[in-house]
């Protein structure tokens, strides 16, 4: 009885190992990326023609044409940038 149980457990472990090897080899041979990214769903960032500067009161000058001000660190001059694409910001209003 004990011999049969040990043999059964060894066979079960062997089958599990073969199953894992088969799954790994099937996924490793795949040439496609796992998450398809289409250019239709991407976001395009581009700089606008204007620059923005920090005023003496600490506020930044406004960018126009759907652009916003981007600056690095403590710099007092930045560039206006626009994002185009399929993105959705969550609403600040509670859902009904």
UniProtKB/Swiss-Prot annotation:
Superkingdom of this protein's organism: Eukaryota
GO annotations of cellular component type: extracellular region
GO MF annotations in UniProt: C-X-C chemokine binding
Subcellular location: Secreted
Residues glycosylated per entry: 74
Transmembrane segments: none
Keyword Signal: yes
Residues in the signal sequence: 1-28
Keywords associated with the record: Disulfide bond, Glycoprotein, Secreted, Signal
Disulfide bonds: 48-67, 52-69, 63-80
Protein task: Salivary chemokine-binding protein which binds to host chemokines CXCL1 and CXCL8.
Protein's name according to its UniProt entry: Evasin P1074
Species of provenance: Ixodes ricinus
